[in-house]
């Protein structure tokens, strides 16, 4: 199988640039419980540094995604990091953590930030909307430093003016 060849080659390869590398085999299987179970058992037996859960967050209902996370995480070693690939909404991250996921990656927070969309506790807001034009309250009074010192009106202005700083502030906020 490919994974066996991958692990063999990985173990034979010296770390690049003096940094230790880690291998996280990916559990696939779409939304089929039997395929995910088979893949998770196969991957769990390999003793890798961590394990990845892939092939989710690509259009299936979120409840089905959450169910597949549970199916896989019941099998994967609890003492290894479990990484859910491509999942990035705040709600999905919290649900993943609740189901035993340790790591996430996704372009969504920065892509949405670059497009004036901010994740907030009240939902997603569009900073290009005129309603923020005269709102001098902080982007997020309970957020990071940049959220506290940046007003919604200022961020709205930056987006309307096409300033790159707007994208940076919004991306930092979303992360």
Task: Give the positions of each predicted feature.
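Long, hydrophilic "mature protein body" segments
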Residues: 4, 44-45, 147-150
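Non-catalytic, usually N-terminal nucleic-acid engagement modules in DNA/RNA processing proteins
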Residues: 1-15, 130, 160
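C-terminal extensions of enzymes
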Residues: 141-175
């Amino acid at each position: 199988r490919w994974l066996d060849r991958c692990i063999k080659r990985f173990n034979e390869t010296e770390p690049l640039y003096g940094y230790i590398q880690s291998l996280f085999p990916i559990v696939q299987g779409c939304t089929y419980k039997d395929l995910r179970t088979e893949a998770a058992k196969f991957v769990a037996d390999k003793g890798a540094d961590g394990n990845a859960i892939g092939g989710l967050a690509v259009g299936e209902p979120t409840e089905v995604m959450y169910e597949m996370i549970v199916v896989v995480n019941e099998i994967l070693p609890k003492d290894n990091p479990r990484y859910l690939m491509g999942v990035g909404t705040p709600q999905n991250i919290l649900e993943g953590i609740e189901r035993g996921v340790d790591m996430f990656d996704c372009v969504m927070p920065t892509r949405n930030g670059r497009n004036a969309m901010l994740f907030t506790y009240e939902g997603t807001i569009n900073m290009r909307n005129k309603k923020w034009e005269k709102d001098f309250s902080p982007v997020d009074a309970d957020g990071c430093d940049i959220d506290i010192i940046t007003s919604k009106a200022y961020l709205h202005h930056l987006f309307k003016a096409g300033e790159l700083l707007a994208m940076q502030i919004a991306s930092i906020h979303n992360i």
